[in-house]
């Protein structure tokens, strides 16, 4: 795992990071002013009655601070119970007569450029899900299907070894689409950059 992608979470709509399916929508935002408009519009949209009554899962708006591609500066991560549930949600937001969707879409389109999307499915998560974890390190990698069982077992062993000292949460996911050569990834959450650096320093000494 040579590559690390570091992101900071701007906004979270709910507390859950345990949904088995999570979809990333990647966007490019040119400046902080446009980013602020997107944050405000997202917050308003996720607080609407339409979302409260129809969206099952959670949404997280993230900013890339290191390791991302030039084309992407931010991403929306939608965590939902299944791909089927996500398809239901997509059908609802595709209604051209939905005013809440139209308002949100107009702000998003005026202040960002769509880059792509990725579909991921959690294999296993570890630690306690918390929206206090706003700094996320992502470690994508490629492996053969025949290696996955051994990787899961090694991850379980790692969790047992660090569960009493590791301050954050982490998960192992399979990348189903949009990842190019990548097949899997680890996501590791911390409350702050300082917490991440402190853990990395202590782990390297152990």
Residue ranges and their predicted role:
Residues 4-14:
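Sec-dependent N-terminal signal peptides
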Residues 17-206:
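Short S/T/G/P-rich N-terminal loop/turn motif that feeds into the first structured element of a domain
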């Amino acid at each position: 795992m040579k590559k690390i992608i570091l992101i900071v979470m701007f906004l979270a709509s709910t507390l859950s990071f345990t949904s088995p399916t999570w979809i990333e929508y990647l966007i490019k935002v040119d400046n902080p002013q446009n980013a602020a408009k997107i944050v405000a519009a997202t917050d308003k949209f996720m607080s609407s009655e339409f979302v409260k009554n129809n969206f099952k899962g959670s949404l997280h708006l993230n900013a890339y601070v290191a390791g991302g591609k030039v084309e992407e500066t931010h991403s929306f991560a939608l965590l939902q119970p299944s791909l089927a549930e996500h398809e239901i949600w997509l059908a609802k937001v595709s209604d051209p007569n939905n005013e809440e969707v139209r308002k949100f879409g107009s702000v998003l389109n005026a202040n960002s450029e769509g880059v792509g999307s990725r579909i991921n499915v959690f294999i296993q998560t570890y630690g306690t899900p918390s929206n206090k974890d706003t700094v996320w390190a992502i470690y994508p990698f490629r492996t053969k299907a025949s290696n996955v069982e051994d990787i899961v077992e090694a991850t379980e062993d790692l969790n047992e070894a660090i569960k009493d000292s590791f301050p954050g949460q982490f998960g192992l996911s399979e990348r189903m689409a949009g990842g190019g050569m990548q097949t899997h990834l680890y996501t590791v959450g911390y409350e702050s950059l300082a917490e991440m650096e402190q853990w990395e320093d202590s782990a390297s000494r152990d």
